[in-house]
Amino acid sequence: MIVPLVTIGQTKLYDNVFIKADDVNAYDNFLKEHYAKIHKERVSQGMLLQWDVWKVVDTPQEDFTHMVTYIYDIEKYPNQAAPYEMLGMSNLQWGTIQKKVNQMRERVAQVKWIDLGSARKKGMDYLPEIMVLNMMKVKDGKAGSYEKEEIKRTKSINNNSTRVGWNFHRRIGEYGNDVYFTHATIDWFDSYKDYLQGWYGEWSDSTEQGFNWNELRELKKMVVMKKLISSTDQ
């Protein structure tokens, strides 16, 4: 069974913070202990649509260890309520938590993006365990052509594929000519093994059938991450 591409309305705003943790396990535990409850409460009160933490897999040389994603409804953004107030915490208590987490990690980057399109296998109505984030930089003057081509060429996902989903995003915000990436695609998998098995197959030339992606965009980075925490978790 094949599910057709769905072009998503411009209602979601993704705010992504890239983190470099000194002690990864300590940071993982700190997030679970102090932040998961706060952001689940924000979701339940409608201040966030979703909150997810992704952890880089098997790539110690990567320049970040985690990606924290806040998904907002643009119609309700921003909200002014402090997250800690919803849990009855004082400003001092919140400040202490922030001081501790700042000693564990560094915020190395923050970017926002919006939806352009997606494709899913039938029955994939959940957040998968594995995300493959592809950071793309569009060629000068080719943004419109690239976006149309990306959507056109991922209209569906074959039922035999190890991939269960795909998303396409446009980076937004204030950045200059020296931007590292302008777009992102995400490939979703149910397990790391499924992702690895996707590499077992015959490769083709980039110019097969007269089309070359390199004329429209450059793949700057591909990072595999696993789900650590999500507000969708039961």
Features from the language model and the residues they span:
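Hydrophobic h-region of N-terminal signal peptides that target proteins for export
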Residues: 1-9
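Short S/T/G/P-rich N-terminal loop/turn motif that feeds into the first structured element of a domain
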Residues: 8-92, 96-234
